[in-house]
Curated annotation (Swiss-Prot):
The gene is gM. This is Envelope glycoprotein M. It comes from Epstein-Barr virus (strain AG876). Residues 39-76, 143-149, 216-245, 289-299 are virion surface. Keywords: Disulfide bond, Glycoprotein, Host endosome, Host Golgi apparatus, Host membrane, Host nucleus, Membrane, Transmembrane, Transmembrane helix, Viral envelope protein, Virion. Envelope glycoprotein important for virion assembly and egress. Plays a role in the correct incorporation of gH-gL into virion membrane. Directs the glycoprotein N (gN) to the host trans-Golgi network. The lineage of its organism: Viruses, Duplodnaviria, Heunggongvirae, Peploviricota, Herviviricetes. Residues 346-405 are annotated as: Disordered. The chain crosses the membrane at residues 18-38, 77-97, 122-142, 150-170, 193-215, 246-266, 268-288, 300-320. Its main location: virion. Coiled coil: none annotated. Residues 1-17, 98-121, 171-192, 267, 321-405 are intravirion. Belongs to the herpesviridae glycoprotein M family.
Amino acid sequence: MKSSKNDTFVYRTWFKTLVVYFVMFVMSAVVPITAMFPNLGYPCYFNALVDYGALNLTNYNLAHHLTPTLYLEPPEMFVYITLVFIADCVAFIYYACGEVALIKARKKVSGLTDLSAWVSAVGSPTVLFLAILKLWSIQVFIQVLSYKHVFLSAFVYFLHFLASVLHACACVTRFSPVWVVKAQDNSIPQDTFLWWVVFYLKPIVTNLYLGCLALETLVFSLSVFLALGNSFYFMVGDMVLGAVNLFLVLPIFWYILTEVWLASFLRHNFGFYCGMFIASIILILPLVRYEAVFVSAKLHTTVAINVAIIPILCSVAMLIRICRIFKSMRQGTDYVPVSETVELELESEPRPRPSRTPSPGRNRRRSSTSSSSSRSTRRQRPVSTQALISSVLPMTTDSEEEIFP
């Protein structure tokens, strides 16, 4: 069966967007690599943004000078860029497999809207557009960092973080109700390559994106307070404490969003929790390296406690997610349509008829006109009753009488 014109248009749009995504992926892979080597057009090494040798938490920011605050050092920035690149590589393989799977599955289209449902299951054009926006914004972020523009880099990374949040939600929910997602998944032919891509490879890619979102939450928190610390007359220690507290609060909203909304679509979404553990390790490294600086500013205990709360909250949220998974497995509240045999049994049940007994005090003497009218009604009553029964009850055949005696 051929797909509808609407589905064909959706598939062509998705394919063109996928080509743009592949081109943007190549560019996003080239930019970080070339930015690490000198004499290739980048003025500075983007990983080394601040000099922690001059870190002083009791000083205020200096005008016309980059004041060092809490940020990622070159090893941590390299780990972050590498993990994001690995996730993008896996997503590149996933979309390539998805295109091949859709080409093979088009031969098994059985409905007018099957093709658009399969495209949405793999990744709608909206999801691809958000992925392209992510790849573009991370390139701009690296280029801006190489020029040491911390204010512009914070704004660009805010756009990147917003695109990452929307992209993660789109990958999990497809921005559709649960029943629409279930209907799209049920339309996929079983034991096919498309089935393997959607139900096995896509959850892996989605969890990788969620893990990268946790790392991006850390970089976003540090970027915001790096820009604030170099824009206003604030103490450096306050900016460090503010960055840690922002990274402590933002994941709580995601934990709530996961249990309220995202868990209905993807139960095994542990990628964000794993990313939070990695981000906590990255955040605690400056506290260990520059312990003397934090101790001299009397912020070591406060920052250490706040940083320690982050993995504790993550562990609690992860434990809640595991408990809810086991609870849903025990309940087994998957609803299925009512079978046709149950409907036939309900229709074949005999219906009780009301008994018609004359009242004891009724007057038996009637006039001739009333008696004649009553005789006519008695003659017409069986006909009307038969018509009523035939109009309400289903017509039974010999085979049905044998099944339902």
